[in-house]
């Protein structure tokens, strides 16, 4: 049973153009189990522009696989759902989809993209959290 979690570790970072005014940023905190090719955690999407999509919390699951793509050594895919509330004058909420994909190196830096209700962000940087970079070095 303990072999199921062999090599498990925590990965934290961002997807998006951090520092660009108004750009949506997806911050991830994931438990990665390479032996099972599984990823589970939380993504928080933030945007400086106020509105219904300015702070979204999404529980996610996904897959991680080894890659042979030059400097990128791993491919990650994430998916999840969150409750999206419709702004007035409409009334109601529904489950919206979140998807992300990225190609990263062993330090969790690379390139990727993500999509959520009526938003699609592609070809943006993926960056490991600063404290994670020293732990993985």
Per-region residue spans from a language model:
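Amphipathic hydrophobic-ligand
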Residues: 22-26, 53-61, 92-96
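N-terminal glycine/threonine-rich, aromatic-flanked beta-hairpin/loop signature
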Residues: 32-57
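Short, solvent-exposed aromatic-acidic interface loops
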Residues: 43-49, 79-85, 115-121
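Mid-chain, well-packed structural core segment of small domains
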Residues: 61-101
